[in-house]
Amino acid sequence: VMNRLGTIKDGKPVYPMFASETHIAKEEIPVAAGIPLYIGIDFGLTPAAVIGQKVRNRWLIQSEVVAFDMGIVRFAEVLRNEIATRFSQASDVYIYGDPAGDFRAQTDESTPFHILRGAGLRAFPAPSNSVDLRLESVAQQLNKMVEGKPAFLVDRRCSQLIKGFDGGYAYKRMEVSGERYADKPDKNMY
């Protein structure tokens, strides 16, 4: 429409309150010197990390590290490099991941958290694995303004995260008559 590219969306977006005009930064979000860095990680063969800072009660998401068909050992190196090159001004680094990443692989004794720590990254399981708690935490920030600015702002370079917010992360339509959707979001690449 109007010569603009769009995406085909199937399902019901998890975050319908996400508005590109409001939640995507117009300019690059700079690193706030002396402010802690927070990183959220999801493991698997497509590991991903979201990197941001909480500055004056606003979550500023500055970067993402998304890998395809990459193990946790290589991903840890890529993440460590991203932190060292782009975020050296941050005061502390807090890394949290899916608590399922604390279970040992059947092939050896290590867990993703052990591997991250071995790479010099202090990472810990998130306090809860509740999907509802995570969804509500993000939705609450998307619905809030702080000093006239969005409480949750994403750097435009975070393309996968933006695609997820823009409908890629969705409740799958159920194969029944009517508009019925699954109770939990579809576990896809977002």
Give a label for each model feature.
Residues 1-2, 49, 95, 165:
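A residue-level signal for conserved active-site and pocket-lining positions in enzyme catalytic cores
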Residues 1-41:
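ATPase catalytic-site recognition across NTP-hydrolyzing enzymes
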Residues 55-185:
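Mg2+-dependent endonuclease catalytic cores in nucleic-acid-processing enzymes, primarily RNase H-like
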Residues 5, 43-45, 99:
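Short, flexible loop/turn elements at secondary-structure junctions
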Residues 186-190:
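Acidic, Mg2+-coordinating catalytic module of metal-dependent nucleases/exonucleases
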Residues 35-41, 45-47, 91-95, 150:
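Structural beta-strand/beta-sheet cores of well-ordered domains, especially the beta-sheet scaffolds
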Residues 47-53:
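Short beta-strand scaffold segments in enzyme catalytic cores
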Residues 25-28, 36-39, 49, 81-85, ...:
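Generic recognition of flexible, low-complexity loop/linker segments
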